[in-house]
Structure formats: C-alpha cells, structure tokens
Amino acid sequence: MHRLSKSAVIISGVLGATSMAAVAQTTPAPTISIAPAITSAPAPGASTASVPCTGTPDPYANYNCLDAYLGDNPFTRFYRYYGLEMGQAGPPSDPNAPPSRVDGWPRTPQTTPPMPFTEWPYGGATAIGVTRSGSIDSPLMTAIANTGLGRWMNEYGFQVYGWIDPGFNFSSNSLRKPGGNAPVSYAYIPNTAQLDQVVLYLDRFPDTVQKDHIDWGLRLSAIYGENYRYTTSYGLASYQLLKYNAVNGYDFPMLYGEVYIPWVAQGLMLRAGRYISVPDIEAQLAPNNYMYTHSITYALDNYTNEGLIGTLFVTKNLSIQMGVEIGTEATFNNAWKQVGNPNPNSAALPNPLYPGSTFAKDPGAVPSYTVCARYTWNDGWDDINPCANGINGGQWGYNNLQWYGVTYYHKFNDHWHLAFEFYDEHENGVPNLKNPTVQALNTALGADGGTPFGSPFMSHNAPNEAQCKTSTPLRCNAYAIGSTMYVNYSPDPLNNFSFRPEIYYDPQGQRTGTAATYYEFSIGWQHWFSPQIEIRPEVGYYHSNGANAFNGGTKNWTLIGAGDVIWHF
C-alpha cells in the first residue's frame, strides 16, 4: 500500500552475500557442489591453491575443505557457516564453478556486501545474462546440503531462504500512536522498536547465462511484520490493514513464475503473477535497500502489480519491457467487480460522486500497461531506465497511480556511486475535500463517505481524497512529483555510507494527507559483520513547506534516528 494512515496521514531478496534486489535480481555466481552458489565476490585473499584439509580446515584457502570444516550434522553446519563467513566480504569461492555471466556482458558494477545489489536494479525479471540457478548464499541451504532434501533441491535449482529484520526509531514526534511519524515510512510509530519483517522465499532461478535451452523459474514469498502495510494489495489478505489496522500482518508480495528464452535477441524473460512494480531504486524487502527507512518518494508510489511482463535484451546494453496488469495494488478478483452502493444519491443525502445503486469495488482494478526501456553504457558503470507503470484511465482507485519516471545510476570508481530517481504520478477525478457536498458525505458517513472506499468497505487506511484549488469542483486531478538520490561512499567491502536528499511535491495532499512540499536530508551507515548479518543506523531531517505535516499536523519538521539489523538464513 502506498499510503500511510489517514489519521496522520515491501520476493527478490537479498540473502547473505546475494542481496538480490527485489526490483532487479543480482548476479548469482555458479552453483557449487554441496551448497548454493553465491552472488557476491569471494572474500579478498581467497585462494584456490591445494592446501591440505588438516587441523582446522580453511575453505577460503582450499574450497575442497568446506565439507570437512562444516561437518555432517545440519545444525552444526548451520552455525559453523555463520562462523566461517564472519568478517569476510563473501563466501568461499569454488574454482571449478562455471562462468557466472555471459561473455562480453557489461561489467558488474557493485558487490554485495556492502551494496544491496550487484547489478543496477531494473525489476520485472530475473537478471538476464548474469544468473545461475541455485545461486543464493544461504546458511540454511548450506546446512541441509548433504541431506536427501538438500541434494534434491540443489540438483533442480530450488532454494529456501530468508531473513529476520527488527528495527527501532527515536523521533522528535511526540504523537506516539500508529502513523505518528507519517509521512515518513518504515518507522511507522514514533519512539518504538518493531518487527519490521520476517521473510521466507522459495526460489528457482532460470539459468540466464546458458544459451542452449529454454529454462524456467518461480518465486513464492511470504512476509510477516509491520511492513505488510506497505505491500498490501486490495483483495489479498487486505482485511488486516483496511478493517483492523493491525500493527503486524502477513502478505505475499511476490508469487510468480518465469520462462526464459535465450534465442530471442540476447534473451527474453516472461514473468506472470504478482511481482514488484518497476523500476525504483528502493524496494519493499529490507536487504534490497541502502538504508533502513525509505524516501517519501518511494513510500508513496507503486509497489506491486498482478499480470504479465516481458523483458527483452535487444543487445547486451539495451533492453525493453512491456507488461499488462490489473492496476496497481489491485487484484484480479476485484477486476470489473460491482458491489452495492449503500449510499446512492438521495434527497436526504445527495451523492453525486457515485449516484447509482452499484459501483466498482475498486475502480482501479482494470487492464493497465507498463512500458520501460533500459540502456547501460560505459561498460556497465552508467545505467538509465525510463518507465511508465500501471497506466490506464487513471480513475481514482485504491492506489491507481499513473507512474511516469526514470532511474539513473553512475559509478565514479570503486568507492563512489550515485543512484537518482525522478517521477510524476497522478490519479484523475479524486473527490474534492473542499467541496461542501463531499464534506457533507464525510461528515455523515465518515472518511471517503459515499465512495467504494468508505464504510462499510474500509474502516482504516482508505485512499486519501484531494485538496483541490477551490471548493467549486466536485472532483479534481491529483498529482505528485518525487525526486530522490543516494550518494554512496564505500571505504571497504564491509561498509557503505549513504546520503539521501529528497524533494517531494504533493500540491493536493492526496498522497501524504497534507498539501505541502517536503524536503529530506538523511545519512545512513551500512555495516556488514559478514555476508549474512548487517546493521543500518541512520538519522534524517524532514521539513514540510506550506503546511504543518508532522506530529499529527502540529509541526513542519521532524528529526528521526533509526536503525535495524538484518539477519539472513
């Protein structure tokens, strides 16, 4: 869901060294013999020399000693693998692994650690030209690798893995209730600790390096925690958010299958199901992000789509995407569905917004399209990705945003890079909060009264109405412009510092609940103890120009310190 609560107004995932962006899976390395392969670079100093497996075996000196080091018991292997990788920038490297990317493909711009991805994110497809099946560095998969189940999963490229992500924040906001930090996201309640997300994936990646056969893949994901409120689609377990406003809940942000056809140009990927909206720098799943909190720009745009999207690499540098879906944060079970209008137009309570006896349950659950192009140059160090996502008639819906934007990445050297995003998004025909008729409906029936999103359909977190220029029109078009950037400095393979400036313009207040221009300046540190354990402390200053948007509308600024721990398994 791309709103915070009206009262105050995130599976690609990284695991361990992979950190595959939900919006663009990273570059997995080839599969190894007893455990899943890894996507991150091997730790510095790793050797392929033949060192005897005597005494305390060192898999970093001799990969063949990995089994001897880990032992046979799955529980022993599990905790020893954490110990093995502690202080390392990657797992042991198999010298006999097949190539992990297509010959002549642009350079891999980043490594994980310390970044949340290795390839510049584009989403909508398992990364073409750089992905091998079974390529996640997972302590759980390593633990069960020598069992019957583990051998079967490894043989066929299946993996089960995930992470646990608790977090906290200290805020200058004194309104300590759900939504008290709004419109700041992913730190929903001021001055508290929370379980952000527990995530479990079942994956099979199609092999996009090979060129000799059609391959297939899938992802089944589940999330539990506070962050469910940002991924919720209307019609899929949405009662937790829209009826009860539960602090913690569950969701299934990615449920899709893929088919990879290597012979079409440089590779064609077809994905069908529920998937993360394209393109975006940030993503719902914690390991796919530089920082713990998210920009307002990201928090209030598209999150997921249900449909079919195709990604075609025309050349190794140029790719195009086209997709058809049912709106944004919309589900097929709501498409074209009509429900009874409990408050049709009447003399006692005029309702010109929805005068008929029925209306669409979600007017935004209609056929929509996505079109994107991506170009990479400078041998992989520059990348631009313009997109139009979730495009239809733009009628006011649960989250029927018409998104037009672009992402851009540039690597200066091995220590510095930046990521930039800009977009315009809008919805049409949003009820005007300044109009007397709309005000009368809201007074008599509650928020969004007389619409598909008022009582009895939604008790909490319904989409905002608009603060139009004047009180005359019944409806108006609401738009927002967002722009954010991450400037990143990595002094070594286990640390990265991110500076995030942002401007978000919400003139009708439909996205945030308060019509204002928002400015943000945040800085964060990402420190990896190993490819499996990461901490992300940060501090951010937010300011609203034109209205008091923070602390329940009493202040025009807020200062928030926050952080989390991501523990992969």
What are the functions of these language-model segments?
Residues H2-P178, N464-C468:
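N-terminal periplasmic/intermembrane-space "pro-region" immediately following the signal or transit peptide
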Residues T27-T39, S50-Y82, P92-P99, W105-P106, ...:
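Outer-membrane beta-barrel pore domains
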Residues P59, R151-S172, R176-G180, S185-A330, ...:
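Outer membrane beta-barrel
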Residues A143-A145, F252, N305, G482, ...:
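Short, conserved clusters of charged catalytic residues that mark active-site
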Residues Y156, Q194, G249-D251, N302, ...:
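Residue-level preference for beta-strand/loop junctions
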Residues I214-R219, K243-G249, Q266-A272, F359-V366, ...:
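Glycine-rich, flexible loop segments associated with nucleotide phosphate handling
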Residues I320-Q402:
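Loop-centered beta-sheet repeat module
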